[in-house]
């Protein structure tokens, strides 16, 4: 008899009361571990082991956004999940990040996280400390968009760093079973054909 067990989509471990120096040692220990995301803020470390499904959504989001930037003739730099840090205060690895337009700084204009575990919105404080203007969470098949105002993130319906982007089209395409059809549909939608 074969028994199939549902595997968790992502695995998450959070540990409090960790110093920055301890975090850097943990970070060093995971330096050659693919599929691991590390976060640090307020003496708390989060270690996230991402699933194949997580990576599929992450890559599809990036791929479709790159298609959008190219179609709309928008300069961009895809930063992927590079480690964003500020002093000894905060470290984050978004699933995808982008510098948009002529931006040349180290702080992305947009960071995106795929969330299969809890804690999406609570992660905003990390990005606020980093000064990231806009953060998107892909959770339960929909995007939650947040734009940084003077002292906090505000939930928004439409991206302010990419106001012409149809978020509903992007979401719909991400949920399509065929990746090829999803890309074709998205390209048709953004080109107006």
Task: List where the protein language model places each region.
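Gly/Pro/Ser/Thr-rich low-complexity, intrinsically disordered segments predominantly at protein N-termini
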Residues: 1-130, 137-193
């Amino acid at each position: 008899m074969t028994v199939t067990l549902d595997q968790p989509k992502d695995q998450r471990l959070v540990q409090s009361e960790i110093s920055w120096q301890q975090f850097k040692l943990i970070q060093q220990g995971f330096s050659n571990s693919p599929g691991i995301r590390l976060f640090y803020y307020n003496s708390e470390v989060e270690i996230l082991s991402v699933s194949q499904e997580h990576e599929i959504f992450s890559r599809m989001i990036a791929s479709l956004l790159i298609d959008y930037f190219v179609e709309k003739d928008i300069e961009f730099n895809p930063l992927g999940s590079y480690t964003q840090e500020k002093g000894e205060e905060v470290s984050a690895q978004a699933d995808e990040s982008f510098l948009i337009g002529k931006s040349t700084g180290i702080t992305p204009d947009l960071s995106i996280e795929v969330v299969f575990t809890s804690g999406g919105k609570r992660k905003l404080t990390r990005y606020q400390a980093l000064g990231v203007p806009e953060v998107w969470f892909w959770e339960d098949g929909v995007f939650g968009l947040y734009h940084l105002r003077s002292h906090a993130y505000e939930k928004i319906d439409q991206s302010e760093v990419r106001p012409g982007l149809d978020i509903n089209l992007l979401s719909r395409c991400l949920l399509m079973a065929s990746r090829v059809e999803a890309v074709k549909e998205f390209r048709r939608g953004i080109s107006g054909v």
